[in-house]
């Protein structure tokens, strides 16, 4: 059911004073410089990736990766950057998490090194591999998690790699360390691990640090790593990545949380607005376009909200700033995909995709069954009028976008397991599996 607070208000009717959500990282049309792509929405607007592939078709190259990581590869020019965690040394006595409610966790039996990789986009060759840190993790995370789940971000001159409790690192494109910063030790809910990626806007790098102790949001000078500001957050563990949007010429950092979804002034860290309504265990990252922010969660209760930024000040819970809210189709692990006027969401274990009118919150038909898809951690991506959904067991189902009833266009299988989200650039699709990095391109 959709709850409308402004009747038949259409976002398109917002006048020239409307907020425009701008991409945080300025890259070329063939780049994927951050976690959810050039627009931060999961869409590559000018890309034309392949429709069909298999282990024997349309694989330009396939590179075996060391260690394990669920970070999405990022692409700038002819280089791909990604992170991984590599176990080393003899096994130690297992150390199980001690967090309250811990379940389904990995036992800690090995030291790890935390590594940034650069890969040739043309050949798949690993160009360099730099170890940033080594330790025996204090928390290993959920059995399905990795110790390198935060995706890097780049402006083309610097690569920012975040390993949470193991540090934040800034490198040049050739792997030279420019600066590093230790933000402390994170203690996550149930010991399920860390996952929020940094966000970059202009000269400022943003890191959200929500955990079971003193949570905070911090802004850093991207050139030096020096803190510009740090603000406390009265929140428990979350795994979502912040986004940065422009409002009336001023960028805001949008961060979801169990207690409040908040917009912070990028310049000062001051809270501009906040809104209640999400659930606990915030994993999905928000998306934004045309002056509206969309955020959702569905761990214990389900909620999907659309927030109009024009006029948003203070506590906007239950006000006309909440254009619409709904319970059906709320995301959990995969983040929403915002493609044109359609907002796509997935529940990670159901094999069902919902399509919502971004203007009204009403269903655009569906939800639609993805017959080939079961469990999904990767967020869906869109390009060339298609939606790509990749399951954990290596199946990518492709469906059409922009049609009243979407067509299921292809089912593609690879011999790997996938939790990282896809990256799209030009005519190529990049899939990062548990063992391999694939470049998928028409032969």
Where do the protein language model's features map onto the residues?
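Noncatalytic, solvent-exposed loop/strand surfaces
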Residues: 22-443
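Hydrophobic h-region of N-terminal signal peptides that target proteins for export
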Residues: 12-23
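Bacterial N-terminal signal peptides that target proteins for export
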Residues: 1-13
